[in-house]
């Protein structure tokens, strides 16, 4: 006699839970978004939010799931801008070059995250800007059309405007002063 899936260890229980929550959300006309730990058993109409590595985006997209890319590196802004630099965010490919056309269509967007357990509320704005600007341009601009030097030149006027409106820019400018 086979055990019910929810009694087949942690993965079985998690799979059972995800499917139950999915049914509840569908009943209320909502779309499920789940972390990439569920990629291998996520219902096809759910969205997979990938935070660990692109391999999970490939697993989810291969199954037909839509995907949001928010990889820990470089998208977690609560980590030091000296490790997750503005340039690494700017140059990041949301969609790997080796994805098929069908897989590329299933990448519906990207997201940067800032988790409050490390920085203080006061630090969050400085950690977010200017890196959020680099992320925005990287998501909206095809990799072959990006120009890091042109982007850097455009930042200073934006910084001046935002600071005049009370937005704090952080110290993550190290990569602005390095060649290319």
Where are these regions (language model features)?
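Short, small-residue-biased leader/transition segments that mark boundaries at the very start
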Residues: 1-3
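Substrate-binding groove of N-acetylhexosamine-processing glycoside hydrolases
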Residues: 5-180
């Amino acid at each position: 006699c086979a055990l019910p899936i929810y009694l087949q260890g942690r993965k079985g229980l998690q799979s059972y839970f995800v499917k139950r929550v999915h049914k509840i959300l569908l009943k209320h006309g909502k779309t499920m978004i789940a972390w990439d730990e569920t990629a291998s058993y996520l219902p096809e109409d759910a969205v997979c939010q990938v935070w660990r590595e692109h391999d999970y985006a490939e697993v989810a997209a291969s199954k037909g799931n839509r995907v949001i890319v928010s990889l820990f590196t470089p998208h977690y802004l609560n980590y030091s801008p000296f490790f997750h630099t503005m340039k690494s965010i700017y140059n990041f490919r949301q969609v790997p070059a080796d994805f098929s056309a069908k897989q590329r269509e299933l990448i519906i967007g990207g997201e940067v995250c800032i988790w409050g357990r490390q920085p203080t509320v006061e630090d969050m704005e400085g950690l977010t800007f200017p890196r959020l600007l680099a992320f925005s341009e990287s998501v909206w601009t095809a990799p072959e059309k990006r120009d890091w030097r042109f982007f850097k030149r455009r930042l200073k006027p934006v910084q001046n405007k935002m600071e005049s409106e009370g937005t704090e820019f952080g110290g993550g400018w190290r990569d602005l002063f390095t060649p290319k």
